[in-house]
Amino acid sequence: MMLSASIRLSAALFLLPFVASAQQAFQPPPPAFQTPSGNIHCRFGAGTLRCDVAEHSYAVPPRPRDCTQNWGGSITLRAQGEAALLCAGDTVRDDEAFVLGYGADWLGPGINCDSEESGIRCANRAGHGFQVSRTKLELF
């Protein structure tokens, strides 16, 4: 009887780290994240991912006539549809947001983002998305 309890305890202690790892893997992603440089901040809410680039030198398309606020520094992406620039008078910048290290992925509902030293690349399941850095903006 003692041997059986000892085996169960040993098995439980052996499996405990694996269970903890599995639980961590299934936690929802943080709703907000930033690049290690702090130049790009992203937030997911209401089915939309928005990323703001604080400082950029990339070329932006002409400002729409109805846009009277900041243009070219904010990009949005939903699980369906194409990425788009956003005319924004606010920001999603949060200096306390999770830092998505270079080489790490953010796996949100229907959208995946990769953080690299060259910037952030986000895409939805349909293959639409964007790649952005201080010097480059590509919508695809």
Feature locations, PLM:
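A low-complexity, Ser/Thr/Gly/Pro-enriched, surface-exposed linker/loop concept
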Residues: 49-100, 127, 132-140
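Primarily extracytoplasmic ectodomains and periplasmic/lumenal surface modules that are beta-strand-rich
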Residues: 40, 46-51, 58, 119-120
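Short, exposed beta-strand-loop hairpins at the edges of beta-sheets
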Residues: 112-114, 119-131
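Bacterial N-terminal signal peptides that target proteins for export
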Residues: 1-11
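Surface-exposed interaction/gating patches
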Residues: 94-96, 104-105, 120
